[in-house]
Regions:
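Non-heme di-metal
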Residues: 1-72
Length: 72
């Protein structure tokens, strides 16, 4: 279980990586949902771009988990 939010400096690498991945996953889902609901093509495009960025971040975080033996 992660330390209290105010104590992030005391988190382990595993806690930090898991938190980062969870936040990226939540943002990805939200951007995908917003893109699906958008009626303005420009707004839809922006949300799809942001979802793609989150997908890239998730990939990077998963790659960082390996050397620390953290499973996604």
């Amino acid at each position: 279980m992660p330390a209290e939010e105010g104590e992030m400096a005391d988190w382990s690498m595993e806690e930090a990586l898991r938190m980062a991945l969870r936040l990226e996953e939540e943002n990805f889902v939200e951007y995908e949902k917003n893109a699906a609901e958008a009626t303005n093509p420009g707004v839809k495009s922006m949300f799809l771009f942001l979802a793609g960025e989150e997908r890239n971040h998730m990939k990077l975080i998963r790659e960082k988990m390996g050397p620390f033996n953290v499973k996604p």
